[in-house]
Curated annotation (Swiss-Prot):
Keyword Nucleotide-binding (UniProt): yes
Subunit organization: A double ring-shaped homohexamer of HslV is capped on each side by a ring-shaped HslU homohexamer. The assembly of the HslU/HslV complex is dependent on binding of ATP.
The keyword Disulfide bond belongs to this UniProt entry's keyword annotation: no
One MF annotation (Gene Ontology) recorded for this entry: proteasome-activating activity
SMART domains listed in its UniProt record: AAA, ClpB_D2-small
Protein name (record): ATP-dependent protease ATPase subunit HslU
Entry binding sites for ATP: V18, G60, V61, G62, K63, T64, E65, D255, E320, R392
Amino acid sequence: MTQMTPPEIVSELDKHIVGQGKAKKAVAIALRNRWRRAQVEEPLRSEITPKNILMIGPTGVGKTEIARRLARLANAPFIKIEATKFTEVGYVGRDVDTIIRDLAEIAVKDGRERAMKTVRDRALDAAEDRVLDALLPAARPVGLNEPEPVDSSTRQKFRKRLREGELDDKEIDIEVAAQAMTAEIFAPPGMEELTQQIQGMFQNLGGGKKKVRKMKIGEALKALTDEEAARLINDEEVKAEAVRAVEQNGIVFLDEIDKVASRSEGQGADVSRQGVQRDLLPLVEGTTISTKYGMIKTDHILFIASGAFHLAKPSDLIPELQGRLPIRVELESLSVEDFQCILTQTDACLVRQYQALLATDGVTLEFTDDGIRRLAEIAYQVNEKTENIGARRLYTVMEKLLEEISFEAGRIGLDKLLVDAPYVDARLEILAQREDLARYVL
């Protein structure tokens, strides 16, 4: 769990997301409260529950990215789910309980990867020994004598060559774990856990068996390292730690929550929409979900719901769900200045990405300040005239702007391109001004 203070968390989020100070502040406080709660003694600690967040704002302004970056900072199990994927119990579709089951799967996978990293060096040594045993088999015994061991200096020479990659392309016969049996099982929605259990039974049928395969040493070393690492970690500990991480630090991002908000008192599809909201209630309030790794309590999982709320209003959500999302944050639409910052100031800004991509073909891409300003203005104008898709508009505009150079890059004599305002206007101004073209091309 991170011990960063809220200002430090916001500063870290600023490296990747432009603006949206209110939303960053809200999630930073929520993350810090996780740490604060851990310092409180029982029995009061178990009474302190996270304050769930409702983010309201148009698409492409950073709602999802804020939650995703927050989960990375916290090193916490994180899942992003569209609320529209789920249906009321009794209807055809996915059950909301699968959110927690999927989160548990993610936590186990992440925990296993972390555990394998800690034993990677020992696993690599063991894998090298097995490869060397195959390369340098001991001499066969004569009569009752023991087999003669290989000279240690010879073994060390081969180990050195192995580590330097000189033997990677040589083929050897090596004993590796046989691949587990796999069976693709199709089942009706809502029975995902049953299919997972049946698949697990099939996989266990072939577990523990080994077979001799002819492989290149480079491939064999990787396969054996993974096999040895899996043998060195305690899988039961990994699963128990994953369940604890989900219960104490899990973050669920519920996107498109406005799409399940009922916009009228009518019947029809709204029945199922309200049903999804009612099914979400116990999950958000705190309940116990059965998973294949054990029972998971959702009392201390942080839920961040988000939606554009173009057609519906937050008040259209059922009152019980509104009460369980006490912190509301409104995200602003992006301005021309925001677009400029997105293009140049974030850690992995678009300008840097395209410069790195074209540098692989030997092309130096340079952007002038007026060129970047013009790009930002065109992206903003197109958003205003057509649908506002936020920062995602920059991807479309940049692709169109650099389409020609991306196609021609690598040609002899083409090693530098300066992108200034006239260059941007020459390629994008007509498209931006004509609404019919902007709607379909940009």
